[in-house]
UniProtKB/Swiss-Prot annotation:
Outcome after substituting residue 429 to A: Loss of transferase activity
Activity modulation: Induced by MgCl(2).
MF GO annotations: beta-glucosidase activity; cellobiose glucosidase activity; galactolipid galactosyltransferase activity; galactosyltransferase activity; glycosyltransferase activity
Compartment(s): Plastid, Chloroplast; Plastid, Chloroplast outer membrane
EC number annotated for this UniProt entry: 2.4.1.184
Cross-referenced Pfam families: Glyco_hydro_1
Disruption phenotype: Sensitive to freezing. Loss of tri- and tetragalactosyldiacylglycerol accumulation during freezing.
Reactions mediated catalytically: 2 a 1,2-diacyl-3-O-(beta-D-galactosyl)-sn-glycerol = a 1,2-diacyl-3-O-[beta-D-galactosyl-(1->6)-beta-D-galactosyl]-sn-glycerol + a 1,2-diacyl-sn-glycerol
Name by which UniProt lists this protein: Galactolipid galactosyltransferase SFR2, chloroplastic
Membrane-spanning intervals of the chain: 4-24
Binding site for a beta-D-glucoside: 222, 266-267, 377, 429, 467, 474-475, 483
Entry annotation: catalytic residues: 267 (proton donor), 429 (nucleophile)
Family affiliation: Belongs to the glycosyl hydrolase 1 family.
Length: 622
């Protein structure tokens, strides 16, 4: 009995220490990341943001549009096409896929660190997964017409280039595909491995962009590793640095005079995590040991990022070593999500994730950056081993929480860390998947206001690039989520239809201003849809605990627009939602509620009988 009592005391002590540690961690997180701020935007003015008034050493503030080879190019036999085509076709393969799906449970902790999404294991708690066949590698691809055509940007770049030009943007961000230029491993020398016709074709596209009055921002690595490199381990191996430099030299030597700025790597830590830690992207199928040790100092995560950092530094030096009258701008596009804990005991996962993803890669290359590119899409509420679908928050079709304040906070945070280097920023990607186009318009305006507010606070930002021009292939989500300013009809020769957001974006770009009128029109339309209970597509599966699955959906679920004020400077952050935090919050707030419920009567008065009436207590349940 005494032993049992001792165990109870020890358990109670451990629970108290655990709760206390999490409370301290969350308090620190809240001070650093959730502190309230006063918006520097004067909302009483007709012009809320005037980007024309801002100049820097490189010239005026610029607007741009972005695309990438894997999203847009046809006639491309890359890793993504091969990955999409891999599907179980027999009972044996289906059974093997089921076993593999069950094994994904081991990766849940990694999922919380990487993207907070649990892999769909078709378990009993999945309210959407009854009798589903094994998941495909790429959702909404096999059921999409002419899936391999993507946007035909390789054979017909004119459509995308003209659409971009007509908005008035001055920067066109695109990429060159490594596997197209080097379709085979250069074991027998560069000359035999390079497709020089592809090099010339890329030059032809770049010339088209420039002839349409736009500067070129060229990305060298955008989530697409050549299949031959994946076969030997890809970025886990040092020799990939040498091969990447062979590729870089070919591109730079051939296209240097046609390119104005360079992005060596797009979101390197995202590629590393989803490829080498989760195995949910093409290029690797990690085993248990690799997963379990992935975030250790010598684990696959740090190892792959190390070689990508070495590759960036070498590419930076090579580009700057070219003799030219113009000074090149070389940087990376770094993905940053605003992550917050859903409950008190989720602060650990958020802290670990942030420690791995926010600063380490940029820290390792910060001495060799002419700009820091920020890719920002929204916020993520971490809950246990996944991301929570918070019913009171608005989301994109891809499951990203809409949170413009996060861009403001991220820019200030990065500026504070790197201001001693005097490195400017570029928002290299920002956008939202929204087929209805009702969310996209206020999303665009509010994020531009967040960006402008950061600039008013002293953050040097050279430009803003929106993702993307036309609806395209969205990685493992296929053709489900719609990110484009332009809709694409895949059943009718990829016919384009301009969305209203296209015209709004063009108006802002050409005027350089965000007006109060445009903000009100966009926001009021969203509010009208929300109050009417209108539905929109959503391409994430959700379990009975409202945790989102990483797997995309072939066909969307339907979710109502959310009636919540997420405009820049207006968003009210929810408190922690776990049971313990709710109880504690209630206990703390209860005395305040009671005080407010007391009827305060400053002047005594009497009834008809002359008796003194004192203030009465009102029931807190009134």
């Amino acid at each position: 009995m005494e032993l049992f009592a001792l165990l109870i005391k020890v358990a109670g002590l451990l629970a108290t220490v655990t709760v206390g540690a999490n409370v301290v961690s969350y308090s620190r997180f809240r001070r650093q990341n959730l502190a309230k701020f006063r918006s520097p935007i004067d909302e009483s003015k007709e012009v809320l943001a005037d980007f024309n008034s801002i100049e820097h050493e490189e010239g005026k503030f610029f607007f741009g549009l972005a695309t990438a080879p894997a999203h847009a190019e046809d006639d491309l036999d890359d890793a993504w096409l091969q990955f999409a085509k891999e599907t179980p076709c027999s009972a044996e393969e289906a059974e093997a896929a089921d076993k593999k799906a069950r094994r994904k449970k081991v990766k849940l902790a990694v999922g919380a660190i990487t993207k907070g999404l649990a892999k769909n294991t078709h378990g009993k708690e999945d309210k959407n997964a009854a009798d589903k066949p094994p998941s495909k590698n790429v959702a909404a691809w096999h059921n999409a017409p002419h899936a391999e055509d993507r946007l035909k940007f390789w054979s017909d770049p004119d459509k995308e280039v003209k659409l971009a030009k007509d908005t008035g943007v001055t920067v066109f961000r695109m990429g060159v595909d490594w596997s197209r230029i080097m379709p085979v491993e250069p074991t027998k020398g560069i000359k035999e491995a390079v497709n020089y016709e592809a090099v010339e074709h890329y030059k032809w596209i770049l010339k088209k962009v420039r002839s349409n009055g736009m500067k070129v921002m060229l990305t060298l690595f955008h989530h697409s590793l050549p299949p031959w490199a994946a076969d030997y381990g890809g970025w886990k191996m040092e020799k990939t640095v040498d091969y990447f430099m062979d590729f870089t030299r070919i591109v730079v030597d051939s296209m240097y005079d046609l390119v104005d700025s360079w992005v060596t790597f797009n979101e390197p830590h995202i590629f590393t995590m989803l490829t080498y830690m989760c195995g949910s992207w093409p290029g690797n199928n990690p085993d248990f040991l690799e997963i379990a040790t992935s975030t250790l100092p010598m684990g696959v995560f740090h190892r792959a990022l190390h070689w990508m950092a070495v590759a960036h530094s070498k590419a930076y030096d090579y580009i700057h070593g070219k003799i030219s009258l113009k000074k090149p701008l070389v940087g990376v596009a770094h993905h940053v999500s605003f992550m917050r804990p859903y409950g008190l005991f989720d602060i650990g996962a958020v802290t670990i994730s942030n420690s791995l993803t926010i600063f380490p890669y940029i820290d390792s290359i910060c001495e060799k950056l002419d700009f820091i590119g920020i890719n920002y899409y929204g916020q993520e509420a971490v809950c246990g081993a996944g991301l929570k679908l918070v019913e009171t928050d608005e989301y994109s079709e891809s499951g990203r929480g809409v949170y413009p304040d996060g861009l403001y906070r991220v820019l200030l945070m990065f500026h504070e860390r790197y201001k001693h280097l005097k490195v400017p920023f570029i928002v290299t990607e920002n956008g939202v998947s929204d087929e209805t186009d009702v969310i996209r318009r206020p999303y665009l305006i509010e994020h531009l206001l967040a960006l402008y507010a950061a600039m008013l606070k002293g953050v040097p930002v050279l430009g803003y690039i929106f993702w993307t021009i036309s609806d395209n292939w969205e990685w493992a989500d296929g053709y489900g989520p719609k990110f484009g300013l332009v809709a694409v009809d895949r059943s009718h020769d990829l016919a384009r239809t301009l969305r209203q957001s296209y015209h709004l974006f063009s108006k802002i770009v050409k005027s350089g201003k965000v007006t109060r009128k445009d903000r009100s029109l966009a926001w009021n339309e969203l509010q009208k849809a929300a109050k009417a209970g209108k539905l929109r597509p959503f391409y994430r599966g959700v379990d009975n605990h409202n945790l989102m699955y990483a797997d995309g959906l072939d066909k969307p679920q339907w979710r109502p627009f959310v009636d919540r004020d997420w405009r820049f400077g207006h968003y009210q952050m929810d408190g922690l939602q776990d049971p313990l935090s709710r109880v504690a919050r209630t206990l703390l707030i209860w005395p305040l509620i009671m005080k407010k419920r007391i009827r305060k009567v400053k002047i005594k008065h009497t009834d008809d009988a002359g008796l003194v009436l004192h203030p009465a207590l009102a029931s807190p349940f009134d």
